[in-house]
């Protein structure tokens, strides 16, 4: 589940590299837990953590370079309520989080994997949404924003029988992340927002 650790990562207390380090996070006593899937350069994660210092924020990312970069920014902002996890998101939710433990999940501009042969790599399949439902507290939300209309429509088709109520809309830029700025530079200024609210618990 955990990616191969590197010495520089192991020495950084912000970064979770193994199960022993994960166990040091007492999820039952952590209070409100928010999880960002694929935090990239970490802009949104750091803003949320700064706005809500009483909450625990866990960022999941597969790219070690991003994790190292963001961990330095966490330190420079003196934020002690962020932990970074180098992992595949699907494995992290399956293996590390118990049922009814997460208050909010967000994923801004996940990879849409547009080629048909790569569709199985997409996050938020019906199976994954059922797992996500199980890990979220009743009434809590998952926010997904994408630049791909095709990916948005695909996700909406995955939603039946996942226990979520859904709101979907087209929104202007508002997150000021690296990917959002990238699209703005290319004159792409509308994005697709899916807000999922847990309305029924799903056993997995």
From Swiss-Prot:
The lineage of its organism: Bacteria, Pseudomonadati, Chlorobiota, Chlorobiia, Chlorobiales. S-adenosyl-L-methionine binds at residues 36, 61, 111. Pfam families: Methyltransf_4 (PF02390). The active site is at residue 111. Catalyzes the formation of N(7)-methylguanine at position 46 (m7G46) in tRNA. InterPro entries: SAM-dependent_MTases_sf, tRNA_(Gua-N-7)_MeTrfase_Trmb, tRNA_methyltr_TrmB_bact. Substrate binds at residues 115, 147, 177-180. HAMAP family: tRNA_methyltr_TrmB. It catalyses: guanosine(46) in tRNA + S-adenosyl-L-methionine = N(7)-methylguanosine(46) in tRNA + S-adenosyl-L-homocysteine. Keywords: Methyltransferase, S-adenosyl-L-methionine, Transferase, tRNA processing. This is tRNA (guanine-N(7)-)-methyltransferase. GO terms for cellular component: tRNA methyltransferase complex. Pathway: tRNA modification; N(7)-methylguanine-tRNA biosynthesis. Belongs to the class I-like SAM-binding methyltransferase superfamily. TrmB family. Its EC number is 2.1.1.33. It comes from the Bacteria. GO terms for molecular function: tRNA (guanine(46)-N7)-methyltransferase activity. It comes from Chlorobium phaeobacteroides (strain DSM 266 / SMG 266 / 2430).
């Amino acid at each position: 589940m955990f990616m191969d650790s590197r010495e520089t990562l192991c020495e950084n207390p912000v970064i979770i590299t193994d199960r022993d380090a994960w166990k040091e996070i007492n999820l039952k006593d952590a209070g409100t837990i928010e999880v960002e899937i694929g935090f990239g350069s970490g802009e949104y994660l750091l803003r949320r953590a700064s706005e809500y210092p009483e909450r625990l924020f866990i960022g999941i990312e597969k790219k070690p370079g991003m994790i190292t970069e963001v961990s330095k920014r966490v330190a420079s902002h003196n934020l002690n309520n962020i932990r970074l996890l180098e992992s595949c998101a699907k494995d992290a939710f399956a293996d590390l989080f118990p049922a009814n433990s997460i208050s909010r999940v967000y994923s801004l501009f996940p990879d849409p994997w547009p080629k048909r042969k790569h569709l199985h790599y997409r996050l938020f399949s019906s199976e994954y949404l059922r797992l996500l439902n199980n890990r979220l507290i009743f009434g809590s939300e998952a926010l997904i924003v994408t630049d791909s209309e095709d990916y948005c429509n695909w996700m909406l088709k995955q939603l039946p029988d996942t226990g979520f109520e859904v709101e979907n809309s087209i929104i202007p830029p508002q997150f000021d992340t690296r990917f959002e700025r990238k699209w703005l530079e290319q004159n792409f200024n509308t994005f697709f927002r899916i807000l999922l609210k847990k309305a029924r618990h799903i056993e997995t």
